[in-house]
Amino acid sequence: MNGPLPRPIDILPHRDPFLFVDELTRLEPGQSAAGTWRLSGDEFFFPGHFPGRPTLPGVLMCEAIAQVGAIAVLTDQRFAGKLPLFGGLDRARFRRQVVPGDTLWLEVELGRMSSRAGKGSGQALIGGADGDLACSCDLLFVVVDG
């Protein structure tokens, strides 16, 4: 995408404390997106997961990946004003623990998209695009009227 990238909060319906994408780093509407999530340690889930050894829950990594995928979907003109929901999650693998102070690089490549559903593959890496793989998964989106 040419020009400045939009802010995730201007595209996604999610809000604090459930908005997990701080900024976009790449966007090809309807095709792919990448962004970052900086984990300060002040997030709501760290005190209870796990006391004395705070670790990002794996399902929240998948949610963060899905939010980046939702940005790729929602910036496609066919889906403007729609709401992409999780339709499924396949082949999720968790390779590294993510802890306070880490920055996740989140990226998604969309596959087939119909007018009501689509697929994508995503991953979360610690530290940047060339960082350590923390999570990978395949996503199924269902798109409904917003």
What role is predicted for each listed range?
Residues 2, 69-107, 134-141:
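Hydrophobic beta-strand-centered segment that forms part of the acyl-chain substrate-binding groove
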Residues 29-30, 98-102, 107-146:
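HotDog/MaoC-like acyl-thioester-processing domains
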